Amino acid sequence: MIAVLFSFVIAGCIYYIVSRRVRRSRLPPGPPGIPIPFIGNMFDMPEESPWLTFLQWGRDYNTDILYVDAGGTEMVILNTLETITDLLEKRGSIYSGRLESTMVNELMGWEFDLGFITYGDRWREERRMFAKEFSEKGIKQFRHAQVKAAHQLVQQLTKTPDRWAQHIRHQIAAMSLDIGYGIDLAEDDPWLEATHLANEGLAIASVPGKFWVDSFPSLKYLPAWFPGAVFKRKAKVWREAADHMVDMPYETMRKLAPQGLTRPSYASARLQAMDLNGDLEHQEHVIKNTAAEVNVGGGDTTVSAMSAFILAMVKYPEVQRKVQAELDALTNNGQIPDYDEEDDSLPYLTACIKELFRWNQIAPLAIPHKLMKDDVYRGYLIPKNTLVFANTWAVLNDPEVYPDPSVFRPERYLGPDGKPDNTVRDPRKAAFGYGRRNCPGIHLAQSTVWIAGATLLSAFNIERPVDQNGKPIDIPADFTTGFFRHPVPFQCRFVPRTEQVSQSVSGP
């Protein structure tokens, strides 16, 4: 009996290995991995800067489309804009799904977020509502909030410049609440910490294969006290933070609005536009979810972009001086104007913002798309439910398109006459995702950074820190290596350019 059972086991293993080899021959190239179920390339997967490893694998296997089996999760990595465009954009109807993460969606409560909603009717409804208000033209209605936040940031920096990172996070969050709900954000509001914690948890849990519960969903039923169920305890903390992040501002707005204590906002406008003959509960649920999108985008990605902008200005003072020369030509008697990114008289600043989103890839691998049915590309089989990663870092660091890609160089987008050179690929499109799942807040994020950057450089010289002898200290241009990328914390100095700075910024 034992011999028979042993024979069946051996036969099963042989069948698995042979069938795997046959199937593997039809898949895109990639590292071979270990031919054991739920193992595959698990031990090949990098913990830090995976975009660099994926690019190197592409070179090793002479391909721009890679296949890996990460512990049972099939993944395809696209290392060039050509493959990304062919699949995620031209075949967007089948490449627009999302990983239905048990950890992120169910346990951590991120099922409200457009970025993680399954492609379908609900996604279309919420995306349509959000995109209408935050289109390139639509964001103009929120310009006052962007300018106000930029001016208040200058005021804070004149008082406590050493807390610049906290001030940026606070003002971006305050702007998000103003735009989304028409309410204010108090100093040291616990909501801000909850938002930071929720986004921090998301960055950790978004890494495919990080938690076993995504491969084995039944693990979600384990009690939190069970040995090895640390993920349940983490999820509980992160979910409470996410719930507070979504619920608090909406409930505050609903409470204050009847008293006339809120300003016009995205949520208030959508509530007023509700179909009174329709399903009011459903409509309000959609409004609440999409209003939270304003903060989700600003709470992490825009903060990262602003921090990277400051880092670039410190590392490249010659760039800073050129931007300031443009700005000074528009400054009237030391007063800081309310800048508008549509101003054609500031081409160098606009080029600087383009370069910023290329130089600091906030999501180097973007959020993975999920293939909704089997597909064939270049003769390769890409199986249904494969997670498809766009290696944005590789696209934006392609030396054939952007020579010396590690260097922050706005001039690459300008012609000899100093005017925009439209023959150079605009990196901002790649920086905000691809196809039908690109970031719907792209226009708000770009204009926010543009306005804040212009305002800061009008008010301050951003300089390197100095040592005890007054000698400038060099700081490295280092970034974190997780799923979402941020500059590693650094010090700098904000030196007012005139004595009028604090008096000239009173806000609109």
UniProtKB/Swiss-Prot annotation:
GO terms for biological process: psilocybin biosynthetic process. The keyword NADP does not apply. Its cofactor is heme. It is an enzyme of class 1 (oxidoreductase). Residues 1-19 form the signal peptide. Pfam families: p450. The pharmaceutical interesting psilocybin as a treatment option against depression and anxiety is being investigated in advanced clinical trials. It catalyses: tryptamine + AH2 + O2 = 4-hydroxytryptamine + A + H2O. InterPro entries: Cyt_P450, Cyt_P450_CS, Cyt_P450_E_grp-I, Cyt_P450_sf, Cytochrome_P450_fung. One of its GO terms (molecular function) is oxidoreductase activity, acting on paired donors, with incorporation or reduction of molecular oxygen. Its EC number is 1.14.99.59. Keywords: Heme, Iron, Metal-binding, Monooxygenase, Oxidoreductase, Signal. Pathway: Secondary metabolite biosynthesis. Heme binds at C439. PROSITE patterns: CYTOCHROME_P450. PANTHER family: P450, PUTATIVE (EUROFUNG)-RELATED (PTHR46300:SF7), P450, PUTATIVE (EUROFUNG)-RELATED-RELATED (PTHR46300). Cytochrome P450 monooxygenase; part of the gene cluster that mediates the biosynthesis of psilocybin, a psychotropic tryptamine-derived natural product. The first step in the pathway is the decarboxylation of L-tryptophan to tryptamine by the decarboxylase psiD. 4-hydroxy-L-tryptophan is accepted as substrate by psiD as well. The cytochrome P450 monooxygenase psiH then converts tryptamine to 4-hydroxytryptamine. The kinase psiK catalyzes the 4-O-phosphorylation step by converting 4-hydroxytryptamine into norbaeocystin. Belongs to the cytochrome P450 family. This is Tryptamine 4-monooxygenase. The lineage of its organism: Eukaryota, Fungi, Dikarya, Basidiomycota, Agaricomycotina.
